[in-house]
Amino acid sequence: MDNTSKINKITKIEVQKRNKKRVNLYINDEYAMAFSTELAFKHNLKIGQEVDYKELKVIAEEDNYIKCKGDALKFIEKSYKTERQVYDKLLSKGYDNKTIERVIDFLTEYKFIDDWRFGELYIEERLKREGRNKIKYSLMQKGISESIIDEKLNCVDRDKEKDALNKIAEKKYKSILKNEEDKTKIYNKLGRFLMSKGYLWEDVKSVLNKLLYSDG
Protein backbone atom coordinates (compact mmCIF):
# COMPACT_ATOMS: atom_id res chain seq x y z
CA MET A 1 0.00 0.00 0.00
CA ASP A 2 1.15 3.52 -0.78
CA ASN A 3 2.51 5.16 2.39
CA THR A 4 0.83 8.43 1.45
CA SER A 5 -2.69 6.90 1.46
CA LYS A 6 -2.68 5.04 4.77
CA ILE A 7 -2.62 6.31 8.34
CA ASN A 8 0.92 6.51 9.65
CA LYS A 9 1.36 6.66 13.40
CA ILE A 10 4.45 7.04 15.54
CA THR A 11 4.73 3.84 17.55
CA LYS A 12 8.14 4.36 19.15
CA ILE A 13 10.69 7.11 19.77
CA GLU A 14 13.91 5.57 21.00
CA VAL A 15 17.02 7.37 22.22
CA GLN A 16 20.08 5.85 20.56
CA LYS A 17 22.40 3.91 22.85
CA ARG A 18 25.63 5.22 21.34
CA ASN A 19 24.48 8.80 20.84
CA LYS A 20 22.06 10.21 23.39
CA LYS A 21 21.58 13.30 21.24
CA ARG A 22 19.82 11.28 18.53
CA VAL A 23 16.62 9.26 18.42
CA ASN A 24 15.24 6.47 16.24
CA LEU A 25 11.68 6.95 15.00
CA TYR A 26 9.34 4.02 14.34
CA ILE A 27 6.16 4.35 12.32
CA ASN A 28 3.58 1.57 12.36
CA ASP A 29 6.12 -0.54 14.31
CA GLU A 30 8.74 -0.19 11.59
CA TYR A 31 11.99 1.81 11.77
CA ALA A 32 11.55 4.98 9.72
CA MET A 33 14.46 7.31 10.38
CA ALA A 34 16.89 8.80 12.89
CA PHE A 35 17.37 12.45 13.77
CA SER A 36 18.46 14.76 16.58
CA THR A 37 16.53 14.93 19.85
CA GLU A 38 16.44 18.68 19.25
CA LEU A 39 14.14 18.13 16.28
CA ALA A 40 11.97 15.65 18.18
CA PHE A 41 11.24 18.36 20.74
CA LYS A 42 10.95 21.11 18.14
CA HIS A 43 8.27 19.21 16.20
CA ASN A 44 6.65 17.97 19.43
CA LEU A 45 6.66 14.36 18.23
CA LYS A 46 4.78 11.88 20.43
CA ILE A 47 3.88 8.21 20.38
CA GLY A 48 0.48 7.70 18.80
CA GLN A 49 0.75 10.89 16.76
CA GLU A 50 -0.23 10.72 13.11
CA VAL A 51 2.43 11.96 10.70
CA ASP A 52 2.69 12.35 6.96
CA TYR A 53 5.78 11.83 4.87
CA LYS A 54 5.98 15.46 3.86
CA GLU A 55 6.56 16.36 7.51
CA LEU A 56 9.15 13.60 7.83
CA LYS A 57 10.93 14.92 4.75
CA VAL A 58 11.14 18.36 6.36
CA ILE A 59 12.56 16.82 9.54
CA ALA A 60 15.09 14.81 7.51
CA GLU A 61 16.25 17.95 5.68
CA GLU A 62 16.59 19.86 8.97
CA ASP A 63 18.54 16.99 10.50
CA ASN A 64 20.85 16.86 7.50
CA TYR A 65 21.45 20.60 7.85
CA ILE A 66 22.25 20.26 11.56
CA LYS A 67 24.75 17.46 10.86
CA CYS A 68 26.29 19.37 7.97
CA LYS A 69 26.67 22.49 10.09
CA GLY A 70 28.25 20.45 12.88
CA ASP A 71 30.80 18.93 10.50
CA ALA A 72 31.59 22.38 9.11
CA LEU A 73 32.17 23.88 12.55
CA LYS A 74 34.37 20.95 13.50
CA PHE A 75 36.41 21.40 10.31
CA ILE A 76 37.11 25.08 10.98
CA GLU A 77 37.66 24.92 14.74
CA LYS A 78 41.44 24.45 14.60
CA SER A 79 42.35 26.83 11.81
CA TYR A 80 40.83 29.48 9.55
CA LYS A 81 39.40 28.10 6.31
CA THR A 82 38.18 29.57 3.03
CA GLU A 83 34.66 29.17 1.69
CA ARG A 84 35.96 26.83 -1.02
CA GLN A 85 37.79 24.64 1.48
CA VAL A 86 34.67 24.25 3.61
CA TYR A 87 32.50 23.58 0.55
CA ASP A 88 34.86 20.91 -0.80
CA LYS A 89 35.13 19.24 2.62
CA LEU A 90 31.36 19.01 3.05
CA LEU A 91 30.92 17.80 -0.52
CA SER A 92 33.45 15.03 0.14
CA LYS A 93 31.35 13.93 3.12
CA GLY A 94 28.35 13.40 0.87
CA TYR A 95 26.21 16.45 1.60
CA ASP A 96 24.06 17.89 -1.18
CA ASN A 97 24.73 21.31 -2.71
CA LYS A 98 21.58 22.90 -1.32
CA THR A 99 22.43 21.96 2.27
CA ILE A 100 26.07 22.99 1.87
CA GLU A 101 25.10 26.39 0.49
CA ARG A 102 22.77 26.90 3.43
CA VAL A 103 25.58 26.08 5.86
CA ILE A 104 28.00 28.36 3.98
CA ASP A 105 25.47 31.20 4.30
CA PHE A 106 25.30 30.59 8.06
CA LEU A 107 29.09 30.49 8.45
CA THR A 108 29.51 33.64 6.39
CA GLU A 109 26.79 35.56 8.21
CA TYR A 110 28.36 34.85 11.61
CA LYS A 111 31.93 35.39 10.35
CA PHE A 112 33.07 31.82 10.92
CA ILE A 113 34.49 32.08 7.42
CA ASP A 114 35.60 35.29 5.74
CA ASP A 115 37.64 35.09 2.56
CA TRP A 116 38.70 38.74 2.85
CA ARG A 117 40.07 38.20 6.34
CA PHE A 118 41.63 34.87 5.39
CA GLY A 119 43.48 36.49 2.50
CA GLU A 120 44.77 39.27 4.72
CA LEU A 121 46.04 36.92 7.45
CA TYR A 122 47.53 34.46 4.96
CA ILE A 123 49.47 37.16 3.10
CA GLU A 124 50.73 38.72 6.31
CA GLU A 125 52.08 35.39 7.54
CA ARG A 126 53.48 34.10 4.23
CA LEU A 127 55.31 37.30 3.28
CA LYS A 128 57.98 36.39 5.80
CA ARG A 129 59.17 33.54 3.57
CA GLU A 130 57.45 33.73 0.17
CA GLY A 131 56.97 36.17 -2.69
CA ARG A 132 53.67 37.51 -3.94
CA ASN A 133 53.49 35.24 -6.99
CA LYS A 134 53.61 32.06 -4.92
CA ILE A 135 51.23 33.53 -2.34
CA LYS A 136 48.74 34.46 -5.05
CA TYR A 137 48.88 30.97 -6.55
CA SER A 138 48.34 29.33 -3.15
CA LEU A 139 45.37 31.55 -2.34
CA MET A 140 43.75 30.85 -5.70
CA GLN A 141 44.18 27.13 -5.04
CA LYS A 142 42.30 27.65 -1.78
CA GLY A 143 39.42 29.28 -3.63
CA ILE A 144 40.06 32.95 -2.89
CA SER A 145 38.97 35.15 -5.79
CA GLU A 146 41.68 36.87 -7.81
CA SER A 147 40.12 40.28 -7.16
CA ILE A 148 40.41 39.82 -3.39
CA ILE A 149 43.99 38.57 -3.68
CA ASP A 150 45.09 41.45 -5.91
CA GLU A 151 43.49 44.04 -3.67
CA LYS A 152 45.19 42.61 -0.59
CA LEU A 153 48.57 42.29 -2.31
CA ASN A 154 48.37 45.88 -3.51
CA CYS A 155 48.22 46.92 0.14
CA VAL A 156 51.43 45.09 1.02
CA ASP A 157 54.31 47.25 2.25
CA ARG A 158 56.90 46.89 -0.53
CA ASP A 159 59.77 47.71 1.83
CA LYS A 160 58.81 44.84 4.14
CA GLU A 161 58.49 42.53 1.15
CA LYS A 162 61.97 43.46 -0.09
CA ASP A 163 63.47 43.16 3.39
CA ALA A 164 62.15 39.59 3.63
CA LEU A 165 63.58 38.82 0.20
CA ASN A 166 66.98 40.23 1.18
CA LYS A 167 67.16 38.06 4.31
CA ILE A 168 66.22 34.91 2.42
CA ALA A 169 68.64 35.71 -0.41
CA GLU A 170 71.56 36.42 1.92
CA LYS A 171 71.02 33.17 3.81
CA LYS A 172 70.85 31.11 0.63
CA TYR A 173 73.80 32.98 -0.87
CA LYS A 174 76.04 32.05 2.07
CA SER A 175 74.94 28.44 1.74
CA ILE A 176 75.74 28.31 -1.99
CA LEU A 177 79.15 29.93 -1.44
CA LYS A 178 80.27 26.89 0.55
CA ASN A 179 80.31 24.79 -2.62
CA GLU A 180 80.45 27.26 -5.48
CA GLU A 181 82.71 30.19 -6.41
CA ASP A 182 81.72 30.94 -10.01
CA LYS A 183 79.58 34.08 -9.97
CA THR A 184 77.55 33.14 -13.02
CA LYS A 185 76.62 29.77 -11.54
CA ILE A 186 75.83 31.38 -8.20
CA TYR A 187 73.72 34.01 -9.96
CA ASN A 188 71.72 31.37 -11.83
CA LYS A 189 71.32 29.03 -8.88
CA LEU A 190 70.31 31.75 -6.44
CA GLY A 191 68.05 33.33 -9.04
CA ARG A 192 66.18 30.08 -9.66
CA PHE A 193 65.76 29.56 -5.94
CA LEU A 194 64.32 33.03 -5.34
CA MET A 195 62.01 32.79 -8.34
CA SER A 196 60.72 29.44 -7.04
CA LYS A 197 59.82 31.25 -3.83
CA GLY A 198 57.50 33.47 -5.86
CA TYR A 199 59.37 36.76 -5.89
CA LEU A 200 59.10 39.28 -8.71
CA TRP A 201 61.94 39.10 -11.24
CA GLU A 202 62.80 42.79 -10.92
CA ASP A 203 63.23 42.34 -7.15
CA VAL A 204 65.23 39.14 -7.59
CA LYS A 205 67.49 40.76 -10.19
CA SER A 206 68.11 43.71 -7.89
CA VAL A 207 69.14 41.57 -4.92
CA LEU A 208 71.33 39.33 -7.12
CA ASN A 209 73.25 42.32 -8.44
CA LYS A 210 73.60 43.70 -4.94
CA LEU A 211 75.00 40.45 -3.53
CA LEU A 212 77.25 39.50 -6.44
CA TYR A 213 78.34 42.68 -8.16
CA SER A 214 78.00 45.53 -5.70
CA ASP A 215 81.28 47.11 -4.65
CA GLY A 216 79.79 47.85 -1.27
From Swiss-Prot:
Gene3D superfamilies per record: Winged helix-like DNA-binding domain superfamily/Winged helix DNA-binding domain
Location in the cell: Cytoplasm
Signal peptide range: none
Keywords: Cytoplasm
CC per GO annotation: cytoplasm
Major site of localization recorded for this protein: cytoplasm
Source species, domain of life: Bacteria
Keyword Cytoplasm in record: yes
Pfam families: RecX_HTH1, RecX_HTH2, RecX_HTH3
Keyword Protease: no
Cystine residue pairs: none
Family stated for the protein in its record: Belongs to the RecX family.
Name of this protein: Regulatory protein RecX
